[in-house]
Design a protein with these regions (language model features):
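Juxtamembrane/interface motifs at transmembrane-helix termini
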Residues: 38-40, 99-105, 132
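Amphipathic alpha-helical segments within well-ordered protein domains
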Residues: 48-49, 65-66, 83, 100-104, ...
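Conserved alpha-helical segments that form or flank metal/cofactor-binding pockets of metalloenzymes
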Residues: 57-60, 74, 80, 86-112
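Mobile cap/lid helix-loop segments that border enzyme active or cofactor-binding sites
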Residues: 1-74, 127-130
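Aromatic-anchored, charged helix-turn/loop surface patch used as a conserved interaction hotspot
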Residues: 34, 38, 104, 110, ...
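Alpha-helical ds-nucleic-acid-binding substructure associated with the helix-hairpin-helix region
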Residues: 112-136
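A short structural micro-motif
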Residues: 67-68, 88-89, 119-124
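Short, contiguous, well-ordered secondary-structure segments
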Residues: 78-81, 85, 132-136
C-alpha cells in the first residue's frame, strides 16, 4: 500500500499542474511517453507523486535532480552507476527499478549492474565506473 495518496492528473490544482507539466515536459521526457510517468492507477510514479503533494518543495527537488542528471560533469554511464550505487545502498526499490533500465540503455554492462545489486566487486575493466562506485 502506498504511503501517499496517488494524485490523479485530472484532480491537480494549478500549482500541482504546473509541476506536473515541468516533470513530464522537461528533459526527463525526451524519448518517453506520458505513460512512462504514470502508474496503472493514473497517478505519477515514484518520487514524482510525492513532489506533487508539495509543489513548491517539489519544484526545487525536481530542479536539483534535473541539474545533477542532465547538467552535471559525469557522463551518462558514470551518473547511472552512481545512482545505482546509492539506490542499492539505501534499498531504494523505485530508484533501482527505474535506473537499472536507464543504465543498461546508456551502455552499462548488465553484469556490472548485477554486481552493484549483489554488492559484489565490479567485473571487467571499467576503471572510471569502479572509481565512481567506490567513491560513492
Amino acid at each position: 500500500m502506498p504511503r501517499l495518496t496517488g494524485l490523479l492528473v485530472n484532480n491537480l490544482n494549478n500549482d500541482q499542474r504546473a509541476l506536473f507539466e515541468t516533470l513530464t515536459g522537461g528533459k526527463r521526457s525526451i524519448g518517453r511517453s506520458l505513460d512512462a510517468f504514470l502508474g496503472p492507477d493514473g497517478a505519477m510514479r515514484g518520487p514524482f507523486n510525492a513532489m506533487l503533494h508539495h509543489p513548491a518543495a517539489g519544484a526545487v527537488v525536481q530542479r536539483l535532480g534535473e541539474l545533477l542528471r542532465f547538467e552535471g560533469a559525469l557522463n551518462d554511464a558514470q551518473r547511472e552507476v552512481a545512482i545505482l550505487t546509492v539506490g542499492r545502498h539505501w534499498r531504494a526499490q523505485y530508484e533501482w527499478w527505474a535506473h537499472a533500465r536507464i543504465a543498461e540503455g546508456v551502455g552499462v554492462a548488465p553484469d556490472l549492474i548485477q554486481a552493484i545489486y549483489d554488492q559484489a566487486p565490479l567485473p571487467g575493466d571499467a576503471s572510471d565506473l569502479t572509481a565512481i562506485h567506490t567513491f560513492v
